[in-house]
């Protein structure tokens, strides 16, 4: 008789088990030793550390925009607010927000199209994707997909914007951490949008973005990893941007 009961976190030596089974006499019990493997992150540890740290944050102002634009920024932020990205998962901005239709409550506002400023449904959603990207730049989360606008924008620095449109281009990042991360977005009474990336800090580095100009209309965005003394111990290139001059509008 061969008896075994395998639970989560246990393993056995298959070769030893086979040898014991083959050498055992008929109708006798055999004992197979199991090894208990302690999980790297227990449920208790996970719950105790869940979303306790602000990994990155960024704020941008929508003040001075049309009522439609401010409405669209707030609506998009409310859709993204509270999104949780599990370890190994990919966050897709378009996958969460979807198409910016009137049925969803979106209004017309200024946006870029074919190198011009025109009225489009959902104008302003790119401020949310750009502010999210800017917050992500203060973390070591992997940026998988990001495209710059055709022309510079006013709400984030050059090289820190992320244009989106249904269904492409998209903005995507991967949670390469051991713990989940949560996206928190808030639009306050002064029309300032704040994006925070909450999670569990897994290293002692401080991460800051740096944009290096190549020429007047192109640049490369880096992340600088700094130790406790403020020394840069590592730099990595995140993306390159190339813009055209702004024709008109804002």
Where do the model's predicted regions map?
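Well-ordered beta-sheet/strand-loop patches within structured domains
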Residues: 1-250
């Amino acid at each position: 008789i061969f008896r075994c009961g395998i639970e989560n976190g246990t393993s056995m030596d298959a070769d030893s088990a086979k040898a014991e089974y083959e050498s055992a006499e008929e109708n006798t019990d055999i004992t197979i030793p199991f090894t208990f493997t302690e999980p790297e992150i227990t449920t208790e540890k996970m719950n105790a550390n869940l979303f306790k740290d602000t990994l990155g944050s960024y704020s941008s102002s929508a003040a001075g925009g049309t009522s439609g634009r401010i409405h669209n920024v707030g609506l998009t932020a409310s859709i993204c607010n509270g999104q949780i990205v599990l370890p190994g998962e990919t966050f897709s901005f378009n996958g969460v927000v979807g198409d910016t239709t009137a049925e969803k409550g979106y209004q017309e506002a200024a946006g870029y199209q074919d190198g011009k400023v025109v009225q489009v449904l959902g104008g302003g959603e790119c401020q949310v994707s750009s502010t999210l990207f800017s917050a992500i730049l203060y973390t070591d989360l992997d940026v998988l997909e990001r495209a710059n606008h055709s022309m510079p924008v006013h709400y984030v620095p050059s090289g820190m914007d992320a244009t989106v449109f249904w269904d492409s281009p998209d903005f995507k990042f991967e949670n390469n951490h051991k713990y989940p991360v949560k996206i928190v977005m808030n639009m306050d009474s002064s029309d300032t949008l704040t994006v925070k990336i909450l999670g569990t800090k897994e290293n002692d580095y401080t991460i800051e973005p740096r944009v290096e100009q190549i020429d007047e209309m192109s640049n490369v965005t880096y992340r600088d990893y700094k130790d406790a003394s403020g020394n840069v111990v590592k730099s990595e290139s995140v993306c390159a941007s190339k813009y055209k001059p702004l024709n008109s509008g804002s």
